[in-house]
Amino acid sequence: MKVIISGGGTAGHINPGLAIAKYIKKREPDTEILFIGTERGLEARLVPRENFEIKMIKVRGFKRKLSMDTLVAVKELFQGLAEARKIIKDYKPDLVIGTGGYVCGPVLFNASRMKIPTLVHEQNAFPGVTNKILSKFVDRVAISFKEAEKYFKDKSKVVFTGNPIRSEMLEVSRETARKKLGIPKDMPLVVIFGGSRGAENINSTVAELIKRHKSDLGFYLIYATGEAQYDGIMKKIGEVKSPNINILPYIFDMANAMAAADLVVCRAGAITVSELTALGVPSILIPSPYVTANHQEHNARALERQGASVVILEKNLRPDILYEEITTLLKDRNKLSQMAKNAKSIGITNATERIYEIIKDIMKNKAAG
């Protein structure tokens, strides 16, 4: 079997694709898989790291306001459609999967027009524009939140699967992870990140928190700034001599970081929330207020209602508030343990298996009809 997977821009679109790819290879080792992405997206680095082939097309997202960028986006859309069609024609896939982001638009549209079996996966409770458009053309739409179904007109195509979790996220033990990361035996680990591109308000808050508590932090900290903001944040924080503070541009080994963590502080993107619950990790969630339909707060509140997370809205975020929330939770081991159990109880760990079964069903139906 030959499969094309397209999705990108942010890790939230790329990691589900990688999880699906690995599961397909596990079930059918002879499968050939090709990713299609853009040079600008994070997929240009993440996909090769996982030893999958990737080809690039030229396409970019549309801005809401009419400008020169809009004209460039239109030009690149037509270019991307042509490039995607050529790649598909040359590769001759048996199946094409989209995991969101503007790059999968030209790919899935072309595949559907070429009568190749197609599937899109939507990670969020409020579907993205690209997936809503593609839903009219593809064979199946896999959703991660049941609330998302109402946004798709043809309900017969929609199947609830949950979000794919990378297999390595489920295979690492806490003890092994802490040893690999060099976390002192009796020291709690807090992992903080704001997404693959970073988050300015979270970064400014955490930078100030570190400046104030360089010598008396009280826990081991792994903190990812996002690559674009790393240099500026390091300049703001100044010299950090503590061996218990590890500041990185990006956490490539998220499996070990999450498995080792006592507490995670992060945004409430769909994939992150799914990984937290699958692993049973307590969290402080700071939903992004800049996303469509405020879907991150909906994700965060769902965990809060289950007693798996504490939610701090960005408008209320300050260094003293965040530090107090972190230290209060770390001191109350019983509460932290209960939060972990609550998170685990709502996690879905077999989404990739569900998606694989849908894939087989699509291909069976295409072959029959």
UniProtKB/Swiss-Prot annotation:
Example GO molecular function: undecaprenyldiphospho-muramoylpentapeptide beta-N-acetylglucosaminyltransferase activity
Superkingdom of the source species: Bacteria
Residues bound to UDP-N-acetyl-alpha-D-glucosamine are T10, A11, G12, N124, R166, S196, I251, Q296
Q: Which Gene3D superfamilies match?
A: Glycogen Phosphorylase B (3.40.50.2000)
- Cellular location(s): Cell membrane
Pathways involved: Cell wall biogenesis; peptidoglycan biosynthesis
**Pfam families assigned to the protein according to its UniProt record, in alphabetical order:** Glyco_tran_28_C, Glyco_transf_28
Q: Which reaction does it catalyse?
A: di-trans,octa-cis-undecaprenyl diphospho-N-acetyl-alpha-D-muramoyl-L-alanyl-D-glutamyl-meso-2,6-diaminopimeloyl-D-alanyl-D-alanine + UDP-N-acetyl-alpha-D-glucosamine = di-trans,octa-cis-undecaprenyl diphospho-[N-acetyl-alpha-D-glucosaminyl-(1->4)]-N-acetyl-alpha-D-muramoyl-L-alanyl-D-glutamyl-meso-2,6-diaminopimeloyl-D-alanyl-D-alanine + UDP + H(+)
GO annotations of cellular component type: plasma membrane
The UniProt keyword set, sorted, is: Cell cycle, Cell division, Cell membrane, Cell shape, Cell wall biogenesis/degradation, Glycosyltransferase, Membrane, Peptidoglycan synthesis, Transferase
Q: Which family does it belong to?
A: Belongs to the glycosyltransferase 28 family. MurG subfamily.
Q: What does this protein do?
A: Cell wall formation. Catalyzes the transfer of a GlcNAc subunit on undecaprenyl-pyrophosphoryl-MurNAc-pentapeptide (lipid intermediate I) to form undecaprenyl-pyrophosphoryl-MurNAc-(pentapeptide)GlcNAc (lipid intermediate II).
Provide the protein name: UDP-N-acetylglucosamine--N-acetylmuramyl-(pentapeptide) pyrophosphoryl-undecaprenol N-acetylglucosamine transferase
Q: Which organism is it from?
A: Acetivibrio thermocellus (strain ATCC 27405 / DSM 1237 / JCM 9322 / NBRC 103400 / NCIMB 10682 / NRRL B-4536 / VPI 7372)
